[in-house]
Amino acid sequence: MMYKQISHLEAWELVKKRDIVIADVRDQDSYEEEHIANALHLSMAKLQEYSEKADKEKPVLVYCYHGISSQSVAQHLVEQGFKEVYSLIGGFETWKAHHPTSDANKN
């Protein structure tokens, strides 16, 4: 199985309509400054632990800065048995240009 690359519009619909895990794989400071609402910070150090403990049936949307690093993380999650994994094309920068964001104080 492969992960699917999706546009910010597809991601927006997915986030609005489904119970989905949103995984931010950028650095901690960037995450704390601003992120997609309800995203969890998934550093490379936390990735293996997450892969072992998370519900693999629940869809996961992975994003990074520009949509490059998220692809390798998405592929890793698929290889770990996650059934439905998405990578955000254009990453957080594209999301931010079109949709609301949140910060550490707001969630």
From Swiss-Prot:
It holds the Pfam family Rhodanese. Its main location: cytoplasm. The keyword DNA repair does not apply. It is an enzyme of class 2 (transferase). Coiled coil: none annotated. Its EC number is 2.8.1.1. It is found in: Cytoplasm. SUPFAM superfamilies: Rhodanese/Cell cycle control phosphatase. The active site is at 64 (cysteine persulfide intermediate). It catalyses: thiosulfate + hydrogen cyanide = thiocyanate + sulfite + 2 H(+); thiosulfate + [thioredoxin]-dithiol = [thioredoxin]-disulfide + hydrogen sulfide + sulfite + 2 H(+). GO terms for biological process: glycerol metabolic process. The keyword Transferase applies. GO terms for molecular function: thiosulfate-cyanide sulfurtransferase activity. Keywords: Cytoplasm, Transferase. Residues 16-104 form the Rhodanese domain. GO terms for cellular component: cytoplasm. Transferase that catalyzes the transfer of sulfur from thiosulfate to thiophilic acceptors such as cyanide or dithiols. May function in a CysM-independent thiosulfate assimilation pathway by catalyzing the conversion of thiosulfate to sulfite, which can then be used for L-cysteine biosynthesis. PANTHER family: FAD-DEPENDENT OXIDOREDUCTASE, THIOSULFATE SULFURTRANSFERASE GLPE. Belongs to the GlpE family. This is Thiosulfate sulfurtransferase GlpE.
